[in-house]
Amino acid sequence: MEGKSASCPEGVVSWYIRTSRLAVALAIIKLRPPGGARQFTESLAERLKRQDESWKSKAEGLHEDLLHLRQELLLTRTLLNTRSSAGQAPGQEIAKVLSQDDTREVNSGTLQTCLPPTPPNSQKVPPKDRQWRQDHRLTKHVQFLQRLSGLRSGFEESLCQDGDVVWDSVVQLLDCVVEDFRQAHTGQPLRHPEQLHNAIQVVAQTLSPGGARQGFPVQHFSRVEDLLKEMVNLLLTNQQLNAFSVQDSLSDCLLALGGNCCITRTPLIQLLMSQIIQLAQQLRDACEKSREEHEHHQVDWVCYQNSFYLFWLLERLAQDTDNRVNQELVVRLETKAFPLADEFSLFSLYMWRIGGLFRAGDS
């Protein structure tokens, strides 16, 4: 009798386990989408990808809002520490600078005529199309950097105390410019190229005065280098119908970064040289395979044609006497030029010329 009662709970537990397994199996079968396991996996992966992109977009938006608040705080703090020569009260000076739009000229054009209208409070503006948000984001960073650089007495102090805000703003502004070129790389028209060029000049002007003396944080400098690499890659691989106008604008932006900014000049020159050396090696490999296999091997003619933009940039950057270029790259550039003299004589001649220009500049 006792053995029978002892086995009863075990039977109940076993029955509950079988029932639970059956319920789980039925739930899986019911929730399983039509098709096979492959379709289910692809559907799940797509759903997770959309969710990840949504979270990433929200995180970027929160980062932008936080950075904007830190920008306003830094401007306010800098203004409080700055005394007007006319004896204006700090509160009045803060209100005046934060409320006015910066209309200082940059080269031949003014940013005020290029930038889209900025609402007084971005938090109250409903979300609009991607291009509007992109323009608005670029505008905010440009205005902050211009206003901060306008406070000449407090600019270097800001770099010492809150340099992270300044450098983060520089990286975000440069990313805004690159984003427009990314869209143009997919065939979309490049809107307001003068706005992008002026924004790049703001970046160069911000980096030039205090960056060399105060030091550029490693994490931000690494991000700037990545964006420079992406810009050069976009310049080298563009094959859209709007290539000429986009290439000219992108070349001008790179020239402004390399010519007016001592921090990015040397990395940009070395990056351009490395890209040319890499392309020269690809051309040489194609020529050797053609000789060995007695058949024509395809050459990346898009990169070959666009490489002359890189030569043009290097020729312009070589005119600056303050060039600290790795001479090993110059030697490699000249060495790679000789094997291409027969098949790609113009390319080889340009390589030899660029090597000579940078050797002369170094001597």
Curated annotation (Swiss-Prot):
Keywords: Chromosome, DNA recombination, Meiosis. Its main location: nucleus. One of its GO terms (biological process) is homologous chromosome pairing at meiosis. Residues 109-130 are annotated as: Disordered. It is found in: Chromosome. GO terms for cellular component: lateral element. PANTHER family: MEIOSIS-SPECIFIC PROTEIN MEI4. Required for DNA double-strand breaks (DSBs) formation in unsynapsed regions during meiotic recombination. Belongs to the MEI4L family. This is Meiosis-specific protein MEI4. The lineage of its organism: Eukaryota, Metazoa, Chordata, Craniata, Vertebrata. The gene is mei4.
